[in-house]
Each structure stands twice: as structure tokens, then as C-alpha cells.
């Protein structure tokens, strides 16, 4: 929460759990459609299928491998309930255009930022100013808790709903005798051991991000003049 600047953030057992919660908060139900991308790890789309919704793949921009917002606009219909964008390999999607689509069609955009902790768009950290953003803390991510993730939401209401759904629908600030479960929840909470690992890892985040950026620049520099190799085109304002 402190790093991203979003007080409505909560830790979960895995980034996949964070995506599932985001889809439920967005109101995705069986029979709905969710626009997504094939350029991602399997859980992005299998989690959509787990809600009973149909996955609709938008086109990928061949210059950067990211979901093309203009393709997405053409796929929206009365069954479309949400759009899932993936900031693949830390490269941020064209959120200016996706936010415009969200406004025009009143459809929420869910940001899969499993690869993008620390990435920015227009000077703002991803997750600081959007309705739903999920992050992964799995073993090979920038920060790891061995396995884990967290969800950032845009308001107190969604935060409270996610907090209850994260733990069987129970409010852990109350005793079991005081609880009255209103919605079914899950065992999606992060345990104290993995959380402690994550807190220590956060001390080194800037150093780790710097190393990733340095490695990326190294590859770009040494691959750019090789015949048949095309480098990715980074998004503007990222």
C-alpha cells in the first residue's frame, strides 16, 4: 500500500486469487463475456473461465505483444462484463485508450500487473489509480513471498467486499459468534510467514527493478543490429 500509494490493497495467497476476486467484484457471472489476451500465462484466462464467463480474445499488437485497445472496442457487446489487460513483461498497455473504452461503455478494466510491480503510466505507479489491479508475488517475480499476490481496488466498498471474500466471508475483526456471513468467500488469505518474507523483499525492490531495467537495455543494445530480430516497441508515457 505504501509503495504503490493505494490504501485499498490487500494481500492474498496468489495473484490468481486476486484476479478471481477482481472478476467477482466487477460482477462477472456465468454467461457473461470477458475480453482478454492470449499473450499471458494460463491463469489469466482459466480464472475467467472459472467464473462461468466466456473468454473473448482481442488482437495483440505485434509491435509490443500487448492487447490492442482498438481491437477490444470492436468486440464489445451486451454480454461484455469486463476487460482484462495484461502488462506483459512489465510493459504497460495503452491505459489512456483502455480507460476511454471503460468510460464509453461503462465496463471495468481489470489490470493484470503480475509482471509490472513498479511500472508507471503517465508518471503514476500501476495500481495506484484504477478500479482493479492484481499483482503476483510468486517465486520468479520482482518481489517474492515464495507464493502470493495482492489486489489493489479503487474504493472502500470494494476493499471491504474483497476483505470478506478473502476469508470465507468472515470478518476477522469480529469473533465467530458476532459474524453473520452474507456472501460466500474463499480461503485466499496470505499467512504471516510469507508476508514476513515479502516485507523483507520490499527493502530491495528498487535495486531489483534497476537490475531488470539494466538487463533489458543490455539485450536491446546487443540485439538491435541483428538481421531478422525486431525489438519490442515500448508504450508511450511508461
Locate the predicted segments by residue.
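Active-site phosphate-binding strand-loop segment of PLP-dependent enzymes
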Residues: 63-145, 150-152, 156-157
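Short amphipathic alpha-helical/adjacent loop interface patches that line ligand
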Residues: 16, 38, 69, 216
Amino acid at each position: 500500500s505504501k509503495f504503490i500509494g493505494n490504501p485499498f490493497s490487500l494481500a492474498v495467497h496468489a495473484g490468481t486469487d486476486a484476479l478471481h476476486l477482481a472478476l467477482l467484484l466487477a460482477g462477472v457471472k456465468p454467461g457473461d463475456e470477458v475480453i482478454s489476451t492470449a499473450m499471458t500465462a494460463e491463469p489469466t484466462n482459466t480464472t475467467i473461465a472459472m467464473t462461468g464467463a466466456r473468454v473473448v480474445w482481442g488482437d495483440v499488437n505485434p509491435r509490443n505483444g500487448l492487447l490492442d485497445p482498438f481491437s477490444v472496442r470492436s468486440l464489445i457487446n451486451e454480454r461484455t462484463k469486463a476487460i482484462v489487460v495484461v502488462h506483459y513483461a512489465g510493459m504497460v498497455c495503452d491505459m489512456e485508450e483502455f480507460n476511454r473504452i471503460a468510460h464509453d461503455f461503462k465496463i471495468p478494466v481489470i489490470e493484470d500487473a503480475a509482471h509490472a510491480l513498479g511500472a508507471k503510466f503517465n508518471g503514476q505507479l500501476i495500481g495506484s489509480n484504477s478500479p482493479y489491479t492484481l499483482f503476483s508475488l510468486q517465486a520468479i517475480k520482482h518481489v517474492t513471498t515464495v507464493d502470493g499476490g495482492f489486489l489493489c481496488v479503487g474504493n472502500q466498498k470494494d476493499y471491504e467486499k474483497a476483505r470478506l471474500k478473502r476469508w470465507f466471508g468472515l470478518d476477522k475483526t469480529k469473533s465467530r459468534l458476532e459474524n453473520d456471513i452474507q456472501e460466500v468467500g474463499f480461503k485466499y488469505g496470505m499467512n504471516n510467514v510469507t508476508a514476513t518474507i515479502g516485507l523483507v523483499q520490499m527493502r530491495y525492490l528498487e535495486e531489483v527493478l534497476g537490475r531488470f531495467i539494466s538487463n533489458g537495455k543490455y539485450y536491446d543494445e546487443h540485439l538491435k543490429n541483428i538481421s531478422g530480430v525486431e525489438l519490442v516497441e515500448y508504450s508511450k508515457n511508461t
